[in-house]
Amino acid sequence: MSTVEEDSDTVTVETVNSVTFTQDTDGNLILHCPQNDPDEIDSEDSTEPPHKRLCLSSEDDQSIDDSTPCISVVALPLSENDQSFEVTMTATTEVADDELSEGTVTQIQILQNDQLDEMSPLGTEEVSAVSQAWFTTKEDKDSLTNKGHKWKQGMWSKEEIDILMNNIERYLKARGIKDATEIIFEMSKDERKDFYRTIAWGLNRPLFAVYRRVLRMYDDRNHVGKYTPEEIEKLKELRIKHGNDWATIGAALGRSASSVKDRCRLMKDTCNTGKWTEEEEKRLAEVVHELTSTEPGDIVTQGVSWAAVAERVGTRSEKQCRSKWLNYLNWKQSGGTEWTKEDEINLILRIAELDVADENDINWDLLAEGWSSVRSPQWLRSKWWTIKRQIANHKDVSFPVLIKGLKQLHENQKNNPVLLENKSGSGVPNSNCNSSVQHVQIRVARLEDNTAISPSPMAALQIPVQITHVSSTDSPAASVDSETITLNSGTLQTFEILPSFHLQPTGTPGTYLLQTSSSQGLPLTLTTSPTVTLAAAAPASPEQIIVHALSPEHLLNTSDNVTVQCHTPRVIIQTVATEDITSSISQAELTADSDLHSSDFPEPPDALEADTFPDEIPRPKMTIQPSFNNAHVSKYSDQNSTELMNSVMVRTEEEIADTDLKQEPPSDLASAYVTEDLESPTIVHQVHQTIDDETILIVPSPHGFIQASDGIDAESVLPLTTLTDPIFQHHQEESNIIGSSLGSPVSEDSKDVEDLVNCH
């Protein structure tokens, strides 16, 4: 990496050692520039890896004494043939009026670092030995075990899936193949002989596990849905005809081989359905205690052959017996207590205390021990799955970040009972609606990709949004003669046009050009004037979004109206700053002149008015200043730009028919909206601990997404699985635990395994 000096205002990039690069599931390259600690950098015994430190400083101030904000940039993926790439970022900061100049626009150019190759996950012989072995026999497994090798089992983590998808993408790109299914399902063994070994790089799992994972990901027949009665009958006939030839049976039914194998294993002609009778429950308890040599009242969660139990019970399948026992009957007989909200919070805290990097490392048996309200370790894990779904993007964040987000979410709910009451009531329009949530990311495209828009470098910022649909009949109509968009009251902090925009310096100090996807330029001038005007025509797009952040001080201490008048479909985002943000302008007005005519819109627009705001809204813990001055510049320089957003909510009326709202929206829409905005427990977190550092927005799921109580009954939804890797269970002869519904082939499934042996 080198220093770039094109202009006098170009920021110098100093390299301590190297830059951290990772890739997400979308194949985007993530560049992380962490905050530097001078003492840590100069310390000889620092344990921080050198590739996680990067210093950014301006040319006129080479010191790193001042705090430098952490920056996470997501760029387009690198081609394997690229020797270098360029990242150009346009950024603005809050500065005093006399300091506002073109120098506030920062341009950073970063070259590809040769040390990237040294950061390959293939650095250890142990990982390579495991990921290059098929493990189709017990001897293969024992051989590597005796050599001291260990490997990961159980559920796949987000990081592992990211590595796998990235490896597949690179393999396809290197060979000019567009779809991985061509390799997986169409190529011969010889043609794809290096495929699985290549995509297993960096994964501490055997090739057989990678093979099974890839098949389930790419085989559309594995996600067909519930078996119909007709399919069940056909499956029985095919099983008699073809035996254990699961591939042939699956092809005849249009389903995957693993799917039909699992269904056959659970299929019995004598199974009852519906509620269990007292006689069935009694029989189940007797059989379990008899087979495990335990007494009634003893807790039994492991070492049970559910196939043997089902055979002895006679009227239920092994899945039904297992679910009934682990979810209810064993807990009831042992005198267990009901699960409460306090237990839910306690579970989060206990998992946090474990300090594990991946949830697959949790010992659920140990965690459930002595917990009277926990019905079984398996039940506790399923409860955890329910809890983590409170975070809408839980699949996209690392486990430590997820835990921290859940802790903060429950802390916010605990400290804001009024918000919880409002969310659960019928007066909030978004209490049962679906949301569209994305990460907070800065996506930076290469210069050559933006030539059609502008020859100058620019950055496209994508904002995460939570959408609530509002009917046009619920708001009073505005004047049909209005052709402007006016937002009065509060401090104007941001203005965005989605789905994307480009911010380009115009050459005039303090003035930037908002370049939209429709190639319409909207010059934006940052001044101390109470009015900030966007000249020229606003884009006549139904996806136009105005972002207006209202000052918490203003919302809590004034009764002025907030009026929105426009002829385009209404999409308004209201945001509230975090506790470290002060009010830069006491009063601001945004006016956008439009070319649109009222004749283009047959229906009149709405006006959203709020005369007062509820007194019970808790005052944010923040220092409010009436105006911005030079004394506060340091406050802004210390903050990560993504932390300026505390809550984001978008309200539209175009897709009301698609919502699942069961109640009538309140008449005072604005009051309800502002209450929701002020207390939305959206969390922005900057990760520093791992190589996969990135800035992440954790967004709580809508209130209606997760039921307050599970209402677990006889037919629980607990998945049929165990706490060990199902792929290797058939090798463990000493275990009587039945595998999961994802069960691996047993020894007689010769066709499934023999195909694998010949792949290498």
Swiss-Prot record:
<dbReference type="GO" id="GO:0005634">
    <property type="term" value="C:nucleus"/>
</dbReference>
<feature type="domain" description="Myb-like 1">
    <location>
        <begin position="225"/>
        <end position="263"/>
    </location>
</feature>
<feature type="region of interest" description="Disordered">
    <location>
        <begin position="24"/>
        <end position="63"/>
    </location>
</feature>
<dbReference type="GO" id="GO:0000978">
    <property type="term" value="F:RNA polymerase II cis-regulatory region sequence-specific DNA binding"/>
</dbReference>
<feature type="region of interest" description="Disordered">
    <location>
        <begin position="738"/>
        <end position="760"/>
    </location>
</feature>
<keyword id="KW-0804">Transcription</keyword>
<comment type="subunit">
    <text>Interacts with the D-type cyclins CCND1, CCND2 and CCND3. Interaction with D-type cyclins may modulate transcriptional activation by this protein.</text>
</comment>
<keyword id="KW-0677">Repeat</keyword>
<dbReference type="InterPro" id="IPR051651">
    <property type="entry name" value="DMTF1_DNA-bind_reg"/>
</dbReference>
<feature type="domain" description="Myb-like 2">
    <location>
        <begin position="339"/>
        <end position="388"/>
    </location>
</feature>
<comment type="function">
    <text>Transcriptional activator which activates the CDKN2A/ARF locus in response to Ras-Raf signaling, thereby promoting p53/TP53-dependent growth arrest. Binds to the consensus sequence 5'-CCCG[GT]ATGT-3'.</text>
</comment>
<keyword id="KW-0238">DNA-binding</keyword>
<dbReference type="GO" id="GO:0001228">
    <property type="term" value="F:DNA-binding transcription activator activity, RNA polymerase II-specific"/>
</dbReference>
<feature type="region of interest" description="Required for DNA-binding">
    <location>
        <begin position="87"/>
        <end position="458"/>
    </location>
</feature>
<feature type="region of interest" description="Disordered">
    <location>
        <begin position="593"/>
        <end position="614"/>
    </location>
</feature>
<dbReference type="Pfam" id="PF20588">
    <property type="entry name" value="DMTF1_N"/>
</dbReference>
<feature type="DNA-binding region" description="H-T-H motif">
    <location>
        <begin position="306"/>
        <end position="329"/>
    </location>
</feature>
<feature type="compositionally biased region" description="Acidic residues">
    <location>
        <begin position="37"/>
        <end position="47"/>
    </location>
</feature>
<dbReference type="InterPro" id="IPR009057">
    <property type="entry name" value="Homeodomain-like_sf"/>
</dbReference>
<feature type="domain" description="HTH myb-type">
    <location>
        <begin position="268"/>
        <end position="333"/>
    </location>
</feature>
<feature type="region of interest" description="Interaction with CCND2">
    <location>
        <begin position="1"/>
        <end position="237"/>
    </location>
</feature>
<dbReference type="GO" id="GO:0006357">
    <property type="term" value="P:regulation of transcription by RNA polymerase II"/>
</dbReference>
<dbReference type="InterPro" id="IPR001005">
    <property type="entry name" value="SANT/Myb"/>
</dbReference>
<dbReference type="InterPro" id="IPR017930">
    <property type="entry name" value="Myb_dom"/>
</dbReference>
<keyword id="KW-0131">Cell cycle</keyword>
<protein>
    <recommendedName>
        <fullName>Cyclin-D-binding Myb-like transcription factor 1</fullName>
    </recommendedName>
</protein>
<feature type="region of interest" description="Required for transcriptional activation">
    <location>
        <begin position="459"/>
        <end position="760"/>
    </location>
</feature>
<dbReference type="Pfam" id="PF00249">
    <property type="entry name" value="Myb_DNA-binding"/>
</dbReference>
<feature type="region of interest" description="Interaction with CCND1, CCND2 and CCND3">
    <location>
        <begin position="176"/>
        <end position="690"/>
    </location>
</feature>
<dbReference type="GO" id="GO:0000981">
    <property type="term" value="F:DNA-binding transcription factor activity, RNA polymerase II-specific"/>
</dbReference>
<keyword id="KW-0597">Phosphoprotein</keyword>
<comment type="similarity">
    <text>Belongs to the DMTF1 family.</text>
</comment>
<keyword id="KW-0010">Activator</keyword>
<keyword id="KW-0043">Tumor suppressor</keyword>
<dbReference type="InterPro" id="IPR046775">
    <property type="entry name" value="DMTF1_N"/>
</dbReference>
<dbReference type="GO" id="GO:0045944">
    <property type="term" value="P:positive regulation of transcription by RNA polymerase II"/>
</dbReference>
<keyword id="KW-0539">Nucleus</keyword>
<keyword id="KW-0805">Transcription regulation</keyword>
<feature type="region of interest" description="Required for transcriptional activation">
    <location>
        <begin position="87"/>
        <end position="170"/>
    </location>
</feature>
